[in-house]
Amino acid sequence: MRKKEILKKGISFALVAAMGASLCACGGGKSSDSSEPKHFYSVEYPKNLPAAFSNDLGNVKIFGDNVIYQSYNEDYTVCSVYQYNIVEQTEKMLWEGTSEQLEDGTTIKNSSVSYFAVDDDNSIYLYVYQSNVTEECLNRDYSATTYDDVIERIMEMWGETEDAAIQEWNNWISGEYTAEDGTVDYAKFMKDYGLEWESTERLLKVDENGNTVYEKVVRETNPNEEGQWTINCNGIYCDGNGNLYVMMNKWSNDGTSDEYYVDVYDSDGNSTGKIELDGYVSNLIRMPNGNVAIGDFSGDHYVLREIDVNTMTVSEEGIEGFDGSLESGAAAYGEDELLIRENGSLSICNMKTHEREKLLNFMDYNIPASSVNSFGILSDGRIAVFSGSYSNTQMKYVYDLAILTEIDESEMPKTERINVACMWLDSNVESMAIEFNKKHEGYHISITEYNDPDAETYDDMLRSFTTAVAADKSIDMVIFNDYSQVVNFASKGLMTDLYQFLDNDTELTRDDLMPNVLTACEMDGKLVCLPTSFSIQTVVGKASDVGTTPGWTFDEMKALLDSKPQGTQLFYGMTRSQALQLCLNLGYKSYIDSATATCHFDTPEFVAALEFANMFPEEFEGQEDEDSSVLMNEGKVLLSEFYLNDFAEIQMYEAVFNDKLTYIGYPTTEGNGAMISLNNIYGITKNCKHPDIAWEFLRQFYLPTDNENDEYSYGFSVRKDGFEKFCENAQKPLEDGGWTWGWGNFEVEIHPATDEEIAAIKDLVYNATAVNGAVTNEIMNIINEEAAYYFSGEQSAEAVADKIQSRMQIYLSETK
């Protein structure tokens, strides 16, 4: 058995390294940081990378010419520290971890490195955590362990009641200790969970060859201590004068106080002082002058404040304006400058003038910005960038080491850019763009994030994005976060009709894609966008309450509520504004014709929508101990909004409602009342210089795939065969004996989907037509302003509908 939140995967690790050198156009698209890099580079990927790069790497850092990293052995029992010299292309082990197991596999001794730092003479400092099972515990006989002992131990470990401990054992733990014949190994559980540990934390300094220079015990603990405090190390750092800084956090176990400080040691391991800090510090940064500064957030920005090691104090004045990217580290770049990571790029920041200069955008050199975890300057002036991320397609971590050499602009090959704008870059999209770039010589997908750091709300950010991107004629493609953005752009004629490409594609046809998703992406008969996946939003209720056929009207919903005792709620937590927006999304195309810039709000249908919204409170005030799942089970809440992207939700809701479900949908005059939610919505702009190349990039998201791991992506496939395969896989036996899912007081054991469940979901999905998020914020604001007069009782619903009709028509005419 396993929990929903835990997905067990056998993870292996590998490094995909392209061989040889390549040149990529540099210049970067416009963004919130609109500066264009004035530096140009060639990029190469070393051939002879160490075998350890194929394992699980941890805590990778570039210091000078070396990559220092931790890597596990083949059976993942020992983690050691290695050094790879980039210039010489040599590898060596600096420190070997230890681990000892009993015959049954129980670990009784382990050592690992929490943090490391490198000095100017290439000495390496390690913060080592050594833990051992106590001698008394090793000699303890567990053979007589009983079920009651196990439950008591669970209660002790997690402070649970007896009933909760029994539930924990039955649902999450027992399967691991139960043999096929039903025999339960209680003794093995007690060995695993009843062990008492003693630990030692120590500082270890080794030279560049791995020889120990000194070893110093920092603290020791044992299970018999009645300690009032817990102490953790948060990182170690070196300055340019041989001093070592150890960040510590000490907090009381009763939660009443915290203490943050930095212990300082000289090059021989002698303690030289302690620096008290005001609060949590994100990390330490070595400055170009060799001093160390603390990095922390002050308000909205990251601030650097230098440490004075002579007085053991921190400067009150700091360098401001960083965006938090210094948590990825920094490297000295000349006498006064730091190399820092900002918004998908590398920049240099002058510590005296505070001026910045962008050196490069990662995407310009096919380096995945979202996966960069270390960078540095080599002794010959080249820039090294190490990246690593989990690949959903390869089901393992993939690592890369890129070496960038500065060249003259005249040496750059001529490359046509396809500029893609988005609010936030998805790592999977980034990976696909990089793969596309490597295969298409002469063209380069360049993705720029447009997110306004000064925006106070999501709506503000949407407006900022829409304004900036709509005005930028250099943008070829847009990745929309919100369907209302698509409506806004398409209504202004800014999007290209994708049907002209789809209908001429030799491998992809309209019949390959979900027909209702295509319809949802149409405006005036033109395919203005395509999502990479979709989900369904609808309403569920007990079949005994709402019947068995999806779809109903406002009057039928009101009648259901009227038939129930006073105080019964239709939905838990829904407000008037939310209810009204749902109605508008459902009937958007009947209310607004974007192609002709006309609207139809002075209708009985919209009046009914206003009356429906008025059934809900202006603000929802729930009780502190209220559980919506219990209220639904007891019939005090009749309906629930249902977000469908897999089949487990069905079984959970059936358990909560304790009845057969009907996907009744939101009240509407047509359709099944379900809405399609589009994810990662792509469009090609009218200004696109190379629309055929843009389509070549876009189409790869919709080609057939044999990848069994597609099910790990959010939502349903836009391809019909992908959706059908998803349904087919949902009926297969579950791995690991299945899993359970809990909601409030309810817990259900998830089983393979039944034929009945599959049929119901297919009917729901294929017949959903409305699109969630169709209403723009500007339109919603006009409606809310006028609807308030009806909700307050000042005007009738009909009068408000007429006023909305008048204002909306003016707005549509002005913004056409």
Task: Specify the residue positions occupied by each region the protein language model found.
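Conserved N-terminal structural module of periplasmic/extracytoplasmic solute-binding proteins
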Residues: 28-84, 89, 115-119, 128-133, ...
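C-terminal motif of bacterial Sec signal peptides marking the signal peptidase cleavage site
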Residues: 22-25
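Glycine-centered hinge/linker elements that transmit conformational signals in sensory
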Residues: 595-627, 651-653, 661-666
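Long, aromatic- and glycine/proline-rich binding clefts that accommodate carbohydrate-like moieties
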Residues: 712-789
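Extracytoplasmic/periplasmic substrate-recognition and gating elements
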Residues: 654-731
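Short, solvent-exposed loop/beta-turn-alpha elements that line the ligand-binding surface or hinge
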Residues: 499-512, 589-609, 665-675, 793
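Beta-propeller blade signature
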Residues: 83-85, 198-210, 262-265
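Hinge/lid segment of periplasmic solute-binding proteins
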Residues: 483-538, 552-556, 660-667
